[in-house]
Amino acid sequence: MKYKDLREFLTLLEGQGELVRIKQEIDPYLEMAEISDRTLRKGGPAILFEKPKGYRMPVLCNLFGTPKRVALGMGQEDTHALRELGKLLAFLKEPEPPKGFKELIGQLPQWKQVLNMPSKVLGKADCQQVVLSGDEVDLYKLPIMHCHEGDVAPLVTWGLTVTQGPYKKRQNLGIYRQQLIGKNKLIMRWLSHRGGALDFHEWKEANPDKPFPVSVAIGADPATILAAVTPIPDTLSEYAFAGLLRGQKTEVTKSISNDLEIPASAEIVLEGYIDPNETALEGPYGDHTGYYNEQEYFPVFTVTHITMRRDAIYHSTYTGRPPDEPAVLGEALNEVFIPILQKQFPEIVDFYLPPEGCSYRLAVVTIKKQYAGHAKRVMMGVWSFLRQFMYTKFVIVCDDDVNARDWKDVIWAITTRCDPIRDTTLIDHTPIDYLDFASPIAGLGSKMGIDATNKWPGETSREWGTPIKKDPNVVKLVDEIWDQLGL
């Protein structure tokens, strides 16, 4: 499935009953977030608020509020198909030369998809049908949502921030929340390890007194949006991966005020710069953890131009205690991670990030155990192999007879196969999410690995218990007579 832009995707969703238009007047202050939250928790549709109170621009929420819609946005029918995308990413992350002609032929579909990677630059784009500059720039005219009563100000949530470091040809797309503090001012909250922050850091070192160019696209096509949240290799651009998802080159255009490329079909684009010497106190905001975060200083994004499509749609979301939209995205993208991990660690059978673990703070891994100490090797691998898991606090490793996605199974394995002293690994002074106030120091905390596997010789001196298994012949017999038993 290919979607030229966000509007084509919305048409498809509406045709499948996956989008509802709200014609009543709804306030972006708290009301939209409350409606979106209730809808998401019952697995409901995407919502287009056609009459935001005090604004003329409609607001789109809950777009990726179910795993099915995430899969549809990636051009797939269901989340199971996302594993194929993971296999492609694993191939692109560490491509190996084919061992023979037969293997070369087998790799042709993957290399064919690679042809869609280069972007197509347009001279004229829909995202620039309306251009505002100078005094015309007024962010207060956008229906930016205020999601929680304790939030300090409205918050831009689904902006795709485009940046480029001074030494890189590749441009980075990242999603960072942005606090509204003035008609042309936003606070750019990006963590130090994220692509945009790394580009900015390099820029400050190379050009300490020059403004850092930034463009932010709101309401891009679904493939481009989802490419920005997918664990792609560092050498691959988000635009290139969006082309792979779409099966068609990503159309971009040059920003009006800088050289950054923006999605040509985006609904709204904010252009401007960050002064390396200007920061502001950000927050507090209710976050995906279910708590309000601490205040901290971050760079200020000054908006010099706003461009948009005619009759533009403002795309937004809210975050809060799981489940929320980031948790749903994490649940769906979980399928993408598995083949990437399996390429490096073939012994991994399944990998699961429970949504209630705030998308990434706890991981359950099942393996085909092969030797003593194997579980600890896998723990270390999860923490170090992909940057996405550097903030994962807890890794639980189980045998392949345990269902990683069934808490009853996992808890049974922990309570019967784990000794608290022998089978827990604690590591101090590791990178931790700044939003994790449970850590003793902001950005620095500990990790715990739990080995809930059966123990091998060398790991225990005791005779190990044998799991009870049912006789398959008896199970089959009872299955055949079950309906006759009246039970």
UniProtKB/Swiss-Prot annotation:
Q: Which GO terms describe its biological process?
A: ubiquinone biosynthetic process
Give the subcellular location: Cell membrane
Q: Which Pfam families match?
A: UbiD (PF01977), UbiD_C (PF20696), UbiD_N (PF20695)
Annotated membrane topology is: Peripheral membrane protein
Major localization listed first in the record, in broad terms: membrane
Q: What does the note accompanying the cofactor annotation read? A: Binds 1 prenylated FMN per subunit.
State the GO CC annotations.
cytosol; plasma membrane
Q: Which reaction does it catalyse?
A: a 4-hydroxy-3-(all-trans-polyprenyl)benzoate + H(+) = a 2-(all-trans-polyprenyl)phenol + CO2
Pathway field of the UniProt record reads:
Cofactor biosynthesis; ubiquinone biosynthesis
Kindly indicate whether the keyword Zinc-finger belongs to this entry. no
Tree of life domain: Bacteria
Cofactor dependence is on: prenylated FMN; Mn(2+)
Record-listed E.C. numbers: 4.1.1.98
* A Gene Ontology molecular function term of the record: 3-octaprenyl-4-hydroxybenzoate carboxy-lyase activity
Q: Does the keyword Lipid metabolism apply?
A: no
- Spell out the catalytic residues: 287
The record's keywords, sorted A to Z, are: Cell membrane, Decarboxylase, Flavoprotein, FMN, Lyase, Manganese, Membrane, Metal-binding, Ubiquinone biosynthesis
- Annotated residues that bind prenylated FMN are located at 175-177, 189-191, 194-195
Q: What class of enzyme is it?
A: lyase
Q: Which residues bind Mn(2+)?
A: 172, 238
Q: What job does this protein perform?
A: Catalyzes the decarboxylation of 3-octaprenyl-4-hydroxy benzoate to 2-octaprenylphenol, an intermediate step in ubiquinone biosynthesis.
Assembly and oligomerization: Homohexamer.
PANTHER family reported for this sequence: 3-OCTAPRENYL-4-HYDROXYBENZOATE CARBOXY-LYASE-RELATED, FERULIC ACID DECARBOXYLASE 1
Q: What is this protein called?
A: 3-octaprenyl-4-hydroxybenzoate carboxy-lyase
Organism equals: Actinobacillus pleuropneumoniae serotype 3 (strain JL03)
